[in-house]
């Protein structure tokens, strides 16, 4: 049984490629075998649903199809039943790669008949079982946490659900099970895991969806080392059992500070070098005014040395400058090192000693190129951090068959929000601070307080993040205070947590791994929509069901909700 992919009539013999999720089989209708089936087969069209019975036979020499696992056999049909007819599909299903994605998402039920997507979802199913089996073997409890919960700040906007029986009040769909898994630790369930559905109302990118799945775990009486080991063990098992790739452990580690200094990013791609080099001290002594001014104002000057990059054309350099400007750079200086010395519009501003010091600092050799960026720290790291990845792509420095994991640790507890003009949590407000830093810097320099947070990064993509949590009420209260929460706000938003912490909360910590992002790596796809059965668009819409959609006035009345007229205006 299956679907008709193609039908061919060769001089009275009808061939049909019958497709199901296992693959394609050729079925053959001959008048001398079954006149009734042969006559009925003449009416078969693409995507008709068929049931056949017959004899399996070897294909005759010359008709073998080596591209199919079933290419050496065919089924000589004795009986045929057309289980259902089909409208003509809006596009040729076998040609999906050349079809606009919006059309494919509108007809997702047809798109999912494609063998690539079916294989993707089967591997996803297999991976889910591997995850469950792994944590079961490690003595974890799989416990579901609520989907309808309280709105608490976790970094993104909440999806809100109005309560009909409590007019004017709202549930929120969980951005993560964070607080519930901490409460489970307080309740004595010392090893929790869940394949959790999470919801975040945020601007979407290629690797984000408004609803997603994360591998969520939490442990009592733990330290980061145990969580690292568990995570690494899962990655080893997952990659080996699904795509036969051996993952090297232990993963490399670096602090947040080291990651930003060397790679300009807290999610470094370590498959290639091109590290950032700080030359602020050398630049401040040269005669190039713009360098000196930046350093005098508290900024930095950093450089990237591109081995063999002296062959970049002027157009290449202009293109790279424009690319850096996307990330805030005002411009970019450069040096080419030839046999005769420096080729650069800024070479005249450096003494021989300064040139020698710079060459040694960045590792400049004959045939290389150095690119400079001078600005405040954030701009320099954003510009050069993204530029190193762009150069690696252009120069073919990335081995796409390589999987390089790295732990990034010791994140700042807070980051300053220019829009809110205040400090916000880098991860979430339940992350344990470095106690020495908390006592030392406190309210005077909160940006200097390190956290006990860690991310796991794969090939430049954050695939998970976690931390040791705050288990003491007094420390949690201090962190809330540093976030400028009042007593009333603490009680209304987190009163239940503070109460729980006062009843003997054990030390605990955990991590959440982005399952959909991991699947993107296993399947080598750049789009998260390729690993989810029914994904949303970048505007968080479902083209197939036309969600989100308007609802009846009666439904809104039941919920005591009125939609502003301005919200109903077309864009």
Where are these regions (language model features)?
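Class II aminoacyl-tRNA synthetase catalytic cores and aaRS-like
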Residues: 1-571
